[in-house]
């Protein structure tokens, strides 16, 4: 890479010499190759902040790759996010490719649900006959699911959450929560705080994180 000076010399029969200098420049104009990490489908950890391990791309270049960057956010929202990876070599050539990150919630795309949003205040939220995605956010909320297969997050505050009918997935999140699945095959997660979890009818799964083993859990056929 770079410039090389070649000296040409011409000599006649009388011994006269003429020199000519030729500059040969080797320039890298070939972009590097980049293969992004595989697309990712990840279950949401939170309604707002979801941290995703993107992995690492594969890169190659005829010289050296100077830098690898991406435009991923610090945390991912629900749904699909396209992450663009860019490799740049020491000559300034670059190549880019994309990775698709999908954050689903309760095993489904957010578009599967009817959205119901709470506020930072104390809310009373009622679901519909459709599959509802209900976020209580802040405050001490009362949340009532309905007949759909609902996905409910209590959020911050001391919440009371009823799944009612349907196969519901309920997370108390933070605070000291009361969670009742009622009918249907429900998955109930108290989250952080001292929680009372009642699976109700049918076959239910209750999740108690290790740090919260003082939660009161009843009528749960499976405990994780």
What would you call each of these model-derived segments?
Residues 45, 193, 204-208:
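Short, intrinsically disordered, charge-biased short linear motifs at domain edges
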Residues 109-110, 117-118, 126-127, 135-138, ...:
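Glycine-centered beta-turn/loop sites at beta-strand termini
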Residues 1-112, 124, 129, 133, ...:
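Proline-threonine-serine-rich low-complexity tracts
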Residues 216-224:
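Short, low-complexity, Pro/Ser/Thr/Gly-rich segments in the mature regions of secreted, periplasmic
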């Amino acid at each position: 890479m770079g410039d090389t000076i070649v000296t040409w010399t011409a000599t006649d029969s009388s011994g006269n010499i003429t020199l000519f200098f030729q500059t040969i420049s080797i320039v890298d104009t070939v972009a590097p190759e980049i293969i992004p990490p595989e697309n990712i489908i990840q279950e949401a950890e939170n309604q707002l902040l979801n941290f995703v391990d993107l992995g690492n791309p594969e890169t190659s270049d005829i010289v050296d790759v100077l830098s690898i960057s991406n435009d991923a956010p610090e945390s991912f929202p629900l749904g699909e996010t396209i992450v663009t990876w860019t490799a740049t070599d020491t000559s300034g050539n670059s190549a880019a490719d994309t990775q698709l990150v999908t954050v689903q919630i309760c095993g489904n795309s957010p578009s599967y649900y009817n959205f119901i949003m709470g506020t930072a205040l104390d809310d009373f939220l009622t679901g519909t006959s459709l599959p509802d995605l209900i976020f209580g956010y802040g405050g001490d909320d009362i949340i009532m699911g309905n007949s759909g297969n609902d996905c409910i997050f209590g959020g911050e505050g001391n919440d009371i959450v009823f799944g009612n009918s349907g196969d519901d997935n309920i997370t108390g999140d933070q605070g000291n929560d009361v969670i009742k699945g009622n009918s249907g095959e429900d998955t109930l997660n108290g989250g952080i705080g001292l929680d009372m979890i009642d699976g109700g009818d049918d076959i239910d799964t209750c999740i108690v994180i290790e740090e919260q083993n003082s939660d009161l859990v009843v009528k749960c056929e499976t405990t994780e």
